């Protein structure tokens, strides 16, 4: 209840009464902040054309001050002639009649406070001043409209001057008569921006235009939206991974080829499109070639679908003949001549591949431009380099030259940069200053930069190729093709006569290949074959590619997918393969996600899988910075790179959740590119949604956290974030910024990274990535997941390493036997197909290699009779890696260390043993020698049971979810949480087992003479207790007995193999007391089938069995000590330790 109104309160109100109209006019001050705030509250609301605090609002006040000065000047002149005119009046413009109101030329209404019916906003505003302000606002809108129409007229003149403008009607007419049209145009003809607009003007409303790169989708959508007068994100939009401006009103959408293929995967007939434009088909990207094959099959079933193939004038007949001699509309390119200057560089025989690129030839070009062309002549320089390392080398030297001359702004351009840094190349240099853009081949066709007059062509390009024999990705530098050289030359001369400097001889150009090698002929085809299988396009070997890939590459990919379990023996998709095809990642990363969904490790696996699917977030410059290394050291994990990335992401999320901390500065201090972390967050969310869609993860419930006030605050924050995003998008394409003379480059950090927190209303200072992140993600959920992940127990960490190890298998590397005596930088590792690999410089083990061999110092405590390379230890390790990349050396990328023996027993696809199982060979190249044969047999038997149970549980889970999705009657029993918990405990117990063994890589000669070969075997052993229900049969090539599809028993050559299966010693069963001569295998088989041995009982006994499993080890066995006369249950290690006590 409100308090009673006292006389004192009334007197106070009278004292502070509102001023009268006359008093308000006398005290009125247009520059007063409170006055401006009241006017903004009245006129610049959320629903108005100009919003309070926006960039447009700031522009209005600048205009208003100029208008006021102009009107005051005219008023003072008129007062001399007409002294009776009011002082503070703002009259109409001199060249307009007083009765004219410019609002009739403006397609919107400007309402005042009284018209709005607002209470309180306008009560302190005099009506006369409100009318004056309203008139000034109308003048501003009229002025802005005149400016817009002036820009529009200029834009239309520029469009009409493009070479393709004369061919617009011809393209539309040809498309009307044919289903497929090839539009071939040289660089700069305008095909990418104009053809979609011609279709829009012709009445097509569902147009998709594919681009090979994301940056091209964004830049073209902005340009076409600006030229077509479409509001950004409405009629014209783009759709790329994690980001989309597409809406229900969108008529033209620019999207990546991979995204369109995903849409075809969901809806094979593509009913949502009338016209498909496939741009840059001449680049021959992998997915582009596949898309052309899909469209060739689709078009007969969709006669209403039109397809336009847009290409440079390169091998046009190939595309035309592929689509039944489709008509070609050829458009001329540039209008201005281009002078080609050949500047071959002298060969330097002493230069090695590891040395940096010499930047001096590029600096000489800059000097020649400065001397020959005056700064008043506009024209920027575009330099084509082969890769990021070459860009960094030239960037450093060019920035030094630019700081000395003050005539250049040097900018890098490559796909690893953030969008903000990529957009800088479209900004304008200051007067008298030129831009020098150092680019990879991304600027060859995908990005068009206005104002380029000079081009420097290094003649080199780096391309990724796949070596199926060594199973590695090889990034190599090649000479470009003649077609690429012409494309690069064409970037000059778009706006005037241009110059192309070629840093090679004309004879080199004549020796170039005519066209680049199609990507489908030089990369791994695993993901493509998997996608083809999921789209049911038939046998990949017979698919109608425009140019088929090498048959060996297809066979390698199919064999790899069969090994990974994605395809069965008949090359049909397995349940895990169907799910892997839905995940936009490599097969090994997809396997991690599926395996992690079985256990209670979904959150850490999601983060690690996302981190391994993007480029490394660590900047190149930070690798040589001691300060960055010291700041990043607490985040490094001695378990491997995936766990370091895991720690980095979790720590970044914690920083994000604290309002008082700046995540950009946090990342810069540690040498981390923040936009890579944004990509991880987006990818993590996508993975989570995919697992939820397939029933492998329970959907998150949208919980209402906090009281009503907290929820109101959250809604207000989201509303403010939406407003910031809208302001940024509205202001993004209006005008280009003027670059500074010294544009800092720090591995992709944008201008916002260098600034502190921006004021809420300043759109120029908005970290738009942060805004999008907070709108797209539930920060509280991410923070809770990060907090829980930081407290992973020892058991969870071991289980997580098992999941990673199985997902990455068979990508293993074994350390060289002499690594412990090498320097840190000289650590060598060997894979099955590649010897002499080294750790990537960004690998956490590259700086701490002692972690990899310090564990094996335990071996020095064992008997020294064996060779150093055959040391016995229970802590041998292998490196599991995500990729093997060869540049100047073969590098292991993103490594994690895993226990060698347990991992090989659980994951190897080929496991061969000798007679007593003390010698094992995994996958035909890694030999394990175990000290105790009985322990070896027990461990082998345990691994067989665990493998079978794990595989069965995974198949049942995937089959159960598939039946649920198809709403079929469930035939498979779902995996219970209790069963998963039991399996987890037994896997952990298995990995914790300790048994001395040696590990070494077999030589080629040893591999050739490894097997006993087929032979006459007198009798097949019957060992149901050891190998379960497996039927043993002689192996036709290796010899010995084939137990399972991966295990072959007693096939390895050994001096004692001929007699090992008949050597028996007396043994007493600890359960039933049986005393008989048995071989080691027969002993284990009897123990596993002994009627008096503990067996799996009813559910009530399961907990007791689990407790026993936790307290004892599968390697423990009865041991009678002769020295002390006592009986024990010891592992072999414990036996040795006990014996030493009596020495």
From Swiss-Prot:
The lineage of its organism: Eukaryota, Metazoa, Chordata, Craniata, Vertebrata. Coiled coil: none annotated. The keyword Electron transport does not apply. The gene is DHX34. Changing residue 279 to A: Results in interaction with ETF1/eRF1, GSPT1/eRF3a and GSPT2/eRF3b. Increases mRNA binding. Reduces UPF1 phosphorylation. Reduces ATPase activity. No effect on interaction with SMG1. Expressed in whole blood, testis and spleen. Also expressed in the brain. SUPFAM superfamilies: P-loop containing nucleoside triphosphate hydrolases. Residues 76-85 have a biased composition (Basic and acidic residues). Forms a complex with RUVBL1 and RUVBL2. Part of a complex composed of SMG1, DHX34 and UPF1; within the complex DHX34 acts as a scaffolding protein to facilitate SMG1 phosphorylation of UPF1. Interacts with UPF1, MOV10, EIF4A3, XRN2, SMG6, SMG7, SMG9, UPF3A, UPF3B, CASC3/MLN51, XRN1, DIS3 and DCP1A; the interactions are RNA-independent. Interacts with NCBP1/CPB80; the interaction is RNA-dependent. Interacts (via C-terminus) with SMG1; the interaction is RNA-independent. PROSITE patterns: HELICASE_ATP_BIND_1, HELICASE_CTER. It is an enzyme of class 3 (hydrolase). It comes from Homo sapiens (Human). PANTHER family: ATP-DEPENDENT RNA HELICASE, ATP-DEPENDENT RNA HELICASE DHX34-RELATED. Residues 810-1143 are annotated as: Required for phosphorylation of UPF1. Not required for interaction with UPF1. This is Probable ATP-dependent RNA helicase DHX34.
